[in-house]
Amino acid sequence: AVGIVDVYRYITGHYAQPQTEALRLMLTSPEAKRYKTTHFDYCTFSGLFGKRNEKELIMHSGLMCLDFDHVEDIMELKQKLLNHEYFDTELLFVSPSGNGLKWIIPVDLKGWEHFRYFKAVANCIKATGLPLVDMSGSDVARSCFLPHDPQAYINPKYKDDVEENIFRPRLGECPF
């Protein structure tokens, strides 16, 4: 299992930079979709799995990944999400395509199923005037491709962990 700090280090590091730059130059959606599935690492923010499907969920992580696609003004939406009145931000980064955002928030399911809680969160987001959330995230086993984003945001509570340098990877070596 990897944590928020591991993912942040990966995203802000150089590990996915070549494939992110290549993807953003692609013109067709089918080509880009194939490229993502074969060239990008991914994680499942919402849980730990034996195999990546809902029935193989070992433990929910207490996190939810909200995906905003085709965003007109990335910086404006980023600020609105960081200042959201109901949800805290654990991690926020630009999607592999470069035209969306991935927003990782903490959740307390309190016995709710992931997909029902996700829909409630999506409705709350919509009610506060933000763009529609991609509903594919309602699948607890949904993978999230990890791009290069040197400007990714991580919650300040992780400051000490982010600054701790427990290893010195060689160029191209994955941090986890």
Mark where each language-model region is.
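Short beta-strand
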Residues: 91-97, 134-139
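A generic structural motif
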Residues: 99-106
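Hydrophobic, Leu/Ile/Phe/Ala-enriched alpha-helical segments that form helix-helix packing faces
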Residues: 26-36, 81-85, 121-129
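Short connector loops at helix/strand junctions that flank enzyme active sites
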Residues: 58-61, 87, 98
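DNA replication initiation modules
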Residues: 1, 50-72, 107-176
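Structural recognition of the beta-strand scaffold that forms the well-ordered cores
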Residues: 64-67, 91-94, 102
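Short amphipathic alpha-helix segments
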Residues: 70-89
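DNA replication initiation on ssDNA origins
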Residues: 1-62, 169-172
